[in-house]
């Protein structure tokens, strides 16, 4: 799902850029689909800032397995595209397992705005819907929830330190999964994103490097374990071990997460 520029020439340039990048990364490009929408339900601000929405269809490269291995390949394609086009386009989702539909509207307007969501052929095992107001950022289509892997209520009050820590690790990062593609995806965290988006970036990176999403969530948003007498020692040892590798992303915050196969929820220790 792509949010592209409304100006035709710029939109075509962005479109062609993605096609070239996908093919260069070994992912066959199949075509574009304009997403049917009903703009009449939107408010004035949402309508005036609405991007041009389209879906890109790509093929799974030969020799790449379904699921996470394919999504890992798409992750690289998306990061190369994002860094090439900078702020001229936003990729809401590029996955073989999930599609993100979102925007500047109320929850009860979502399925009316996106006609796809009332199509009987659209059947899913998991669906997450979330609505919130922007608190520390200006509202925009791309900052609406859900993100690619999480929806988030609250704030990440340690976000500056979290983002700086992720940046400082990049010089020594190595990935047996991404290998030579590692240089294409850094920086991991988009500094222009919201706190929710930065956490989403981090969870995505951990997952693409072989860490199950629930584990990635547990080490970034740990329980209150240090002086918790009610917690068993084995669980304390777990959190103490991972605390040497990742600082906590502290809220207060509540998170629902999904990769299309599993779904879970967590509260932070505040």
Positions of the model-derived regions?
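Conserved short alpha-helical segments that host acidic/polar catalytic motifs at enzyme active sites
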Residues: 1-270
């Amino acid at each position: 799902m792509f949010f592209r520029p409304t100006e035709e020439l710029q939109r075509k340039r962005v479109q062609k850029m993605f096609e070239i990048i996908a093919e260069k990364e070994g992912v066959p490009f199949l075509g574009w689909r304009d997403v049917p929408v009903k703009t009449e339900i939107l408010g004035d601000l949402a309508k005036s800032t609405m991007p041009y929405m389209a879906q890109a269809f790509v093929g799974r490269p030969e020799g790449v397995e379904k699921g996470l291995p394919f999504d890992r390949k798409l992750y690289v394609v998306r990061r190369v595209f994002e860094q090439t086009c900078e702020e001229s386009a936003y990729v809401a989702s590029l996955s073989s397992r999930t599609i993100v539909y979102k925007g500047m509207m109320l929850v009860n307007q979502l399925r009316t705005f996106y006609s796809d969501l009332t199509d009987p052929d659209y059947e899913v095992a998991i669906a997450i819907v979330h609505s919130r107001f922007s608190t520390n950022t200006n509202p925009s289509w791309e900052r609406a929830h859900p993100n690619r892997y999480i929806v988030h209520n609250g704030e990440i009050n340690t976000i500056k330190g979290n983002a700086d820590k992720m940046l400082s690790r990049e010089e020594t990062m190595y990935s047996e999964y991404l290998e030579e593609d590692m240089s294409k995806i850094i920086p991991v965290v988009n500094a222009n994103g919201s706190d929710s988006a930065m956490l989403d970036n981090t969870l995505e990176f951990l997952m693409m490097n072989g860490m199950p999403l629930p584990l990635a969530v547990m080490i970034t948003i740990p329980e209150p374990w240090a002086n918790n007498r009610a917690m068993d020692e084995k669980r304390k040892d777990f959190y103490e071990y991972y605390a040497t590798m990742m600082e906590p992303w502290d809220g207060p915050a509540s998170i629902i997460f999904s990769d299309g196969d599993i779904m879970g929820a967590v509260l932070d220790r505040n």
